[in-house]
Amino acid sequence: MPVVSLKVNGHAHQVDADPQTPLLWVLRDEIGLTGTKFGCGVAQCGACTVHVDGQAMRSCVTPVSAIAGRKVTTIEGLGSRAAKAVQKAWVDLDVVQCGYCQSGQIMSATVLLEQNPKPSDEDIDLAMAGNICRCATYARIRAAIHAAAAQLSA
């Protein structure tokens, strides 16, 4: 198998992987970063969301070959001011119920606040539409995003 070079969370990785292997499985099985979750395998639930060059991307349908030379950030590598505000708001407002979808939710919310520091409810709903929460904590997710935005603007 060909060797694929990746930069994940600021670290260079060389992995032996078929170029069509989804990034999700390379992150989890080859690199050992299990915070990114498998939910549906067809980019419909958002559990597999990572950042690629600062944009939210579904890793379950992204071939690892499409990522060569690009910057990948997983939930384990988040460290921006917006990410810290989102994580704090998630804890403060008790957003998590079962927790399975939360890494994807946090990844999407972080990109939203990095691009739009004062989102409206509509902005939040649009940005988070690709993330499904089977426990239906959507109201708490929206409240946490507003709280994180307020913290960032303080």
Segments and roles (model prediction):
Residues M1-A154:
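Signature of N-terminal electron-transfer/Fe-S-associated modules in redox systems
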